Amino acid sequence: MNKEQLEKMTNGKGFIAALDQSGGSTPKALKEYGVNEDEYSNDDEMFQLVHDMRTRVVTSPSFSPDKILGAILFEQTMDREVEGKYTGDYLADKGVVPFLKVDKGLAEQQNGVQLMKPIDDLDDTLDRAVERHIFGTKMRSNILELNEQGIKDVVEQQFEFAKKIIAKGLVPIIEPEVNINAKDKAEIEEVLKAELKKGLDALNDDQLVMLKLTIPTKANLYKELADHPNVVRVVVLSGGYSRDEANKLLKDNDELIASFSRALASDLRASQSQEEFDKALGDAVDSIYDASVNKN
């Protein structure tokens, strides 16, 4: 593990950019960027277009390591190059800590939750991530209803994978998303917090994780988790809120920082001039940085 990157992730001021839309969500991400499905005829062309979009983001002067601590990549992005370097190396050289999304998507809903699908090639993927100088990983589950067994299952599965990831020298981001429209969102979050605390308490001193959570209904609910000795940082997802709304809610939560995807890229368009693009990205970065660093 890179100690300098660990120090940056633990104490740095800023947020994490989530650039990890994968196969399923790529057409939607491209459409929002202004690239329609009739502009590519197969997956290779689609992934090239999305890589071009991400390259435009990470090479922009607005994508500044003074405000962006890390970036989460999709597996394809890790294996591609930006300006002649593997994406992870490009980011690290720029001062941005690279993470890799390792999950294979969500299973069908059961007990009010969606567990992760099996990750059969996890070992190989992690070995490649280490080779590509990736610092950590991210994997997402989804909680839709107040069901204690379901929530317990989500957390257990996350920690089971997390331990394998830690064993390879990487820092896992555990992401049990709570759907922002869930009927009992506040109660779900209380149960989730208790289960996460159990999982964290069972780790050895040297087993470090990060958490990526939905912004809680009750402000500062996750402060205890952020202060846990095994937690490097707690980051939050935008989860379907607009950027302004997500930023407003984030400001009420001390110690939590953003890890936004759609809320970061929502004003970016393929048709923008470089100047317009840099300004739109810069405005988004500034507002998300402000919500991550300057609290109410």
From Swiss-Prot:
Its EC number is 4.1.2.13. Pathway: Carbohydrate degradation; glycolysis; D-glyceraldehyde 3-phosphate and glycerone phosphate from D-glucose: step 4/4. GO terms for biological process: glycolytic process. InterPro entries: Aldolase_TIM, FBA_I, FBA_I_Gram+-type. It is an enzyme of class 4 (lyase). Signal peptide: none annotated. The keyword Lyase applies. The active site is at 175 (proton acceptor), 212 (schiff-base intermediate with dihydroxyacetone-p). One of its GO terms (molecular function) is fructose-bisphosphate aldolase activity. Gene3D superfamilies: Aldolase class I. Keywords: Glycolysis, Lyase, Schiff base. SUPFAM superfamilies: Aldolase. Coiled coil: none annotated. It comes from the Bacteria. The keyword Iron-sulfur does not apply. It catalyses: beta-D-fructose 1,6-bisphosphate = D-glyceraldehyde 3-phosphate + dihydroxyacetone phosphate. PANTHER family: FRUCTOSE-BISPHOSPHATE ALDOLASE. HAMAP family: FBP_aldolase_1. Belongs to the class I fructose-bisphosphate aldolase family. This is Fructose-bisphosphate aldolase class 1. It comes from Staphylococcus haemolyticus (strain JCSC1435). The gene is fda.
